[in-house]
Amino acid sequence: VVFVALGLWVGREHLTDVWRSFLGRRSNLNDDDEIMSYRAAVTGMLLGSVTMIGWFVYLGTPLWSSILYIFLLMTIFTGLSRVVAESGVAAIITPMNASDFMIFGLGGKLIGAQAATNFSLGYIFGADIRVFLMGVVANGLKLIEGMNKHSRRIVTQAIAIAILLGLAGSMYTILALSYRDGGINSSPWFFKSMPGVIARTALHGLDADPTYWTGLGFTGIGAVAMLVLTWVRQRFLWWPLHPIGFPIMTSWVVDWMWFSIFFAWVIKVIILKYGGAAVFTRSRDFFLGLIVGRMFISGGWLVVDYLTGTVSNPIFWI
């Protein structure tokens, strides 16, 4: 929360102008060159938030806890998007998700059994989020910033169409495979392990446990630590620890990728030391090509599996 709040504070002047544009007041911003108007962007954010809050309220969740849950959810998504955009990691997952905070932190006694059950379902879209739209789209917008306005808007429309087709196609595929072959015969995580986690979390909420003040206290300590790390980095150029790593350092995904990050850092240092900035700039195309090639091979084997009816060609799943 502090990580996101500090970012919003730094951009407060820009965000204030965005809000003025939404209200139709005079501002210092011109959105003619953006992929969409600021009014459309803010309207979408508000409508989406109200819809999600209304969905939880309709399911019997108290209004206050619904608002708090969506606030935490959007804060986590925003923070992870910044981590992906600034650090360059391909995927990341939050160590603490909104459902765990509400159920295990605030406790089932405070939020109620119905809310705990509803929030446990939030694991589906708010916990297992190694790849999520905000992070992917943020990188996509960075890649197209050199295009003209018309081309950028075409790409944005293509992204929206891809999202809709992906939703429809994935839902159909899951249902078709589940009814035809049986979900238990498919991915153990999605059809066995993850539903078990959701069920156990919901049952824990039904126990009506009190608020976990010790855990909330450690949350406060983490907030103070983030403030200190950010302050030290801004005041001392020699400080080696970037605060962007603090919110994700206990994520299991980091355990998988830390050596790759370290290895990439070593390569970058060597290129800059012996080749300079010019060589580093030219070398980026090569390393981007490695990433594209890796994903192309994965997608290619997926097509081969579909055409031949074979399985067991693993795709990088993180």
Regions found by a protein language model. Name each.
Residues 1-318:
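Alpha-helical multipass membrane-protein architecture
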